[in-house]
Amino acid sequence: MLNTLIVGASGYTGAELALYLNRHPQMNITALMVSAQSVDAGKLISDLHPQLKGIIDIPVKPLTDAEEAAKGVDVVFLATDHKVSHDLAPIFLAAGCTVFDLSGAFRVQDAEFYRRYYGFEHQHTDWLAKAVYGLAEWRAESVKQAQLIAVPGCYPTAAQLALKPLLDAQLLNSAQWPVINAVSGVSGAGRKASLTSSFCEVSLQPYGIFNHRHEPEISTHLGTPVIFTPHLGNFARGILETITCRLQPGVTQQDVAEAYHNAYHDKPLVRLYDKGVPALKSVVGLPFCDIGFAVDGEHLIVVATEDNLLKGAAAQAVQCMNIRFGFPETQSLI
């Protein structure tokens, strides 16, 4: 039995983590924590998230001393802001904890990336160099050896799962960059109230055009440039990405299908469509990424869907934890 701590437990992702870990037979939740200044400190997690009533009825504690909180803890999940994770992760790592960071603080091994896209100077480049990017289906062997696992972003997870098999099989024409148009539910903006995400204001619209921090994350880990445009959708949760690519001359629909089959036939949390493309409702509330595609000559359109809070965050973090400690990969997830 491993003792685990969730920091940032009051948010949407933190609540999903708590639910997964509470029903995991190998995990014992020692505490649910939030920042010392949080208005949620002292409240029951089940009062903040009523779906947890009768399941997890424990208070959310303020984190005032990370070194003290680390005592007796084996595994830490950081569902916190990027700068908060940047500051906290090294403390828990120094205490010997295995850390799964759901922020962007350790995803890209380039200090300039953080200055440009996150607005802070990275002070822990030693841990940045050691961090393993936790794209579970592709980095399992590295995850097994890691102490710090940087869980990929929600958009990058779906984009990479859709594109990596095609790039590895050299099916795409590199003269045309993949174009990723992605729509996410409002929960992707977090639980904190804002005008943009309020019920009467939310509307389908693009944002972060040419400067969203997930574009360089996707490009870096794919090893190829992409054009990425995220959109805010007028629904609560889920991500749908429509990706337009150009195939190499002579590549057939069967070649594309075989590339996906070879990559994911033994990966239980990626579901492939033999015909048609997935809809958002097929994944909301579930830990899967669903992928379908269509080919017309040299043109390829791939559609990938996931729940942004699950496969795009909490479920992938727990999947990586299962891989790291040798548990069944889908334990507590399905």
Swiss-Prot record:
<dbReference type="Pfam" id="PF01118">
    <property type="entry name" value="Semialdhyde_dh"/>
</dbReference>
<comment type="similarity">
    <text>Belongs to the NAGSA dehydrogenase family. Type 1 subfamily.</text>
</comment>
<dbReference type="GO" id="GO:0003942">
    <property type="term" value="F:N-acetyl-gamma-glutamyl-phosphate reductase activity"/>
</dbReference>
<dbReference type="GO" id="GO:0005737">
    <property type="term" value="C:cytoplasm"/>
</dbReference>
<dbReference type="InterPro" id="IPR000534">
    <property type="entry name" value="Semialdehyde_DH_NAD-bd"/>
</dbReference>
<protein>
    <recommendedName>
        <fullName>N-acetyl-gamma-glutamyl-phosphate reductase</fullName>
        <ecNumber>1.2.1.38</ecNumber>
    </recommendedName>
</protein>
<keyword id="KW-0028">Amino-acid biosynthesis</keyword>
<dbReference type="GO" id="GO:0006526">
    <property type="term" value="P:L-arginine biosynthetic process"/>
</dbReference>
<comment type="pathway">
    <text>Amino-acid biosynthesis; L-arginine biosynthesis; N(2)-acetyl-L-ornithine from L-glutamate: step 3/4.</text>
</comment>
<dbReference type="InterPro" id="IPR050085">
    <property type="entry name" value="NAGSA_dehydrogenase"/>
</dbReference>
<dbReference type="GO" id="GO:0070401">
    <property type="term" value="F:NADP+ binding"/>
</dbReference>
<dbReference type="InterPro" id="IPR023013">
    <property type="entry name" value="AGPR_AS"/>
</dbReference>
<dbReference type="InterPro" id="IPR000706">
    <property type="entry name" value="AGPR_type-1"/>
</dbReference>
<dbReference type="InterPro" id="IPR036291">
    <property type="entry name" value="NAD(P)-bd_dom_sf"/>
</dbReference>
<dbReference type="GO" id="GO:0051287">
    <property type="term" value="F:NAD binding"/>
</dbReference>
<comment type="function">
    <text>Catalyzes the NADPH-dependent reduction of N-acetyl-5-glutamyl phosphate to yield N-acetyl-L-glutamate 5-semialdehyde.</text>
</comment>
<feature type="active site">
    <location>
        <position position="154"/>
    </location>
</feature>
<keyword id="KW-0055">Arginine biosynthesis</keyword>
<keyword id="KW-0560">Oxidoreductase</keyword>
<keyword id="KW-0963">Cytoplasm</keyword>
<dbReference type="Pfam" id="PF22698">
    <property type="entry name" value="Semialdhyde_dhC_1"/>
</dbReference>
<keyword id="KW-0521">NADP</keyword>
